[in-house]
Amino acid sequence: MTERTGYRATTKFLIASPTKVRPVANVVKNKPYPEAMAILENMPQKGAVLISQTMKSAASNALYKNKQLDEDMLFVKEIMIDEGPRLKRIWCRGKGRADILLKRMCHITVVVDERAGE
């Protein structure tokens, strides 16, 4: 009695701050796949490009596993933006001091599924 969880794609170790990518993900959550892709293409943020690549992969996985599906039948069921490791870099400051600059990474997981009404 396991419930089908949809078709998943994950992209890991992307150099983008999770706090900057999450607002982009919240815009397209629970939207039909074609509408979500159209929204992401018109957004100026770097996170929109990263999410759209992962979403294309999830849709491709869905179409490969279920030949009867069409892209118009899919919707974005779930998007998770998780925090990854941080790259530590040195930022030289005045008077011989240095600060640590953290380059944050994120993991993007997109789950698409077939709409229940069809």
From Swiss-Prot:
Its Gene Ontology cellular component terms are: cytosolic large ribosomal subunit
UniProt xrefs under Pfam families? Ribosomal_L22
Q: Does the keyword RNA-binding apply?
A: yes
Keywords annotated in UniProt: Ribonucleoprotein, Ribosomal protein, RNA-binding, rRNA-binding
The record, for CDD domains, names:
Ribosomal_L22 (cd00336)
Assembly and partners? Part of the 50S ribosomal subunit.
Q: Quick one: a GO biological-process term for this protein?
A: translation
Per its record, what are the GO molecular function terms?
Answer: rRNA binding; structural constituent of ribosome
State the taxonomy lineage.
Answer: Bacteria, Pseudomonadati, Spirochaetota, Spirochaetia, Spirochaetales
Q: Which PANTHER family match?
A: CHLOROPLAST 50S RIBOSOMAL PROTEIN L22-RELATED (PTHR13501), LARGE RIBOSOMAL SUBUNIT PROTEIN UL22M (PTHR13501:SF8)
- Indicate what this protein is called per its UniProt record: Large ribosomal subunit protein uL22
Function, as annotated, reads: This protein binds specifically to 23S rRNA; its binding is stimulated by other ribosomal proteins, e.g. L4, L17, and L20. It is important during the early stages of 50S assembly. It makes multiple contacts with different domains of the 23S rRNA in the assembled 50S subunit and ribosome. The globular domain of the protein is located near the polypeptide exit tunnel on the outside of the subunit, while an extended beta-hairpin is found that lines the wall of the exit tunnel in the center of the 70S ribosome.
The similarity annotation says:
Belongs to the universal ribosomal protein uL22 family.
